[in-house]
């Protein structure tokens, strides 16, 4: 069901593209277009479902998902501004049909900011899978609408690292168990934030430092957005 939904969504996203942008393509900075053909759907699956899983796994400590997610939204707003202004950024495709995303991104930012008020440590409410998966899928979908998937991946670098830590831990454990009979671990615990908890870091320190890193990743994404 998940795969069918992504295929339909990717097809609909492709329909929104202006006629001067090749169908089923990936933009790689400075107006470079890479046609993907059938692999566009595979790529869409990784972007949308990968984003959903990244935010879902990131939502493991009080306030962390909101603090890591908001900088990414701000990068997408800048990408949207560039996509709706001719000549503002040579690295962004001109997409006059996506200006309605301002309202959607603003609503998402406001919702996440409001949620943080109640989810800050000690949290009084929790998002759960429904909220975290939806935020990740939304992030990936907006990035695809803006042809800014790579920029989004860089901005969400901290969440990507958290996702990869969980994937690496699982795969390494399974492989070593199959080879040696005893599963081994790369991290003390996965995902990454639990590894640092095992090292004795406080929850507040982990969230704040990951937040700083998220800002740095988003800053790098803005640099790439302007000059790459």
What are these regions (language model features)?
Residues 17-21, 220-228:
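Juxtamembrane boundary at the C-terminal end of a transmembrane helix
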Residues 13-14, 79, 148-150, 167-169, ...:
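Surface-exposed beta-strand edges and their flanking turn/coil or helix-capping segments
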Residues 1-161:
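"…together with the soluble PPM/PP2C metallo-phosphatase catalytic core" -> "…together
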Residues 205-225:
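Final/C-terminal transmembrane alpha-helix of multipass membrane proteins
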């Amino acid at each position: 069901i998940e795969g069918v939904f992504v295929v339909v969504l990717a097809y609909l996203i492709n329909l929104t593209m202006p006629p001067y942008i090749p169908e089923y393509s990936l933009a790689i900075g400075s107006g470079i277009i890479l046609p993907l053909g059938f692999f566009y759907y595979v790529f869409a699956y990784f972007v949308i479902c990968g984003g959903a899983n990244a935010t879902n796994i990131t939502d493991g400590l009080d306030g962390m998902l909101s603090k890591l997610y908001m900088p990414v939204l701000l990068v997408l707003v800048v990408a949207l501004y560039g996509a709706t202004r001719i000549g503002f950024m040579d690295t962004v495709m001109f997409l006059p049909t996506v200006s309605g995303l301002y309202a959607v991104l603003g609503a998402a930012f406001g919702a996440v900011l409001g949620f943080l008020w109640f989810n800050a440590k000690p949290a009084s409410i929790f998002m759960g899978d429904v909220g975290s998966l939806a935020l990740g899928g939304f992030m990936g979908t907006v990035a695809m609408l803006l042809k800014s998937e790579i920029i989004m991946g860089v901005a969400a670098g901290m969440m990507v690292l958290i996702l990869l830590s969980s994937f690496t831990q699982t795969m390494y454990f399974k492989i070593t168990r199959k080879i040696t009979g005893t599963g081994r671990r790369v991290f003390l615990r996965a995902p990454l934030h639990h590894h640092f908890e095992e090292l004795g870091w406080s929850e507040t320190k982990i969230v704040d430092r990951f937040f700083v890193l998220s800002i740095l990743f988003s800053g790098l994404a803005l640099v790439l957005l302007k000059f790459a």
